């Protein structure tokens, strides 16, 4: 994380940028976030103004299964990889290892999900105060959100008696925005 700030009698600023990464404690799970923020404000005569802008980008690759439960349900004698099975991963069979536990390594390798989120929040204000008893203020704000969910399932199995499925892929997107525009006139004379 890096930040820079400063100012004087007529204004001030603050700028920051950050990066966060977490690979998780279980196989196949990551999180990355990039963030940027800038705030400024100033005053000149009858006018004062300011803005606040924040942007973030997050990338998430979550686990596809409950890895801990799957490790407990799989017998320790079942190999992770087995070239005789579709996809090349080991899992139970009725003759030797009759379990319907999920091979968590196979599940993470064969099924992939990725979330990407962009978010921009900002506000801007301007105030005009020609007299102590009279002021006008404009306030504007915006919240933009862009979301993408990608999913891919490769060919192969991760548990016994699983039906064959051809590879498939899905992608979903969502874009939303909210805006605020506000005008305020204040009169306060005793």
Region roles according to the model:
Residues 7-10, 43-46, 128-134, 189-190:
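Outer-membrane beta-barrel strand-turn architecture
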């Amino acid at each position: 994380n890096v930040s820079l700030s400063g100012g004087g009698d007529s204004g001030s600023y603050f700028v920051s940028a950050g990066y966060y990464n977490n690979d998780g404690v279980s196989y196949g799970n990551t999180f990355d976030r990039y963030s940027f923020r800038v705030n400024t404000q100033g005053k000149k005569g009858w006018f004062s103004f300011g803005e606040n802008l924040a942007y973030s980008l997050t990338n998430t690759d979550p686990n596809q299964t409950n890895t801990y439960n799957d490790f407990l349900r799989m017998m320790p004698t079942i190999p992770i990889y087995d070239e005789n099975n579709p996809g090349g991963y080991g899992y139970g069979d009725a003759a030797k290892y009759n379990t319907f536990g999920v091979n968590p390594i196979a599940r993470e390798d064969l099924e992939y999900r990725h979330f990407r989120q962009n978010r921009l929040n900002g506000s801007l204000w301007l105030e005009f105060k020609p007299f102590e008893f009279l002021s006008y203020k404009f306030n504007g704000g915006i919240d933009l959100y862009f979301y993408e969910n990608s999913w891919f399932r490769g060919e192969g199995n991760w548990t016994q008696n699983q039906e064959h499925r051809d590879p498939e892929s899905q992608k979903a997107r969502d874009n939303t925005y909210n805006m605020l525009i506000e005008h305020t006139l204040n009169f306060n004379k005793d």
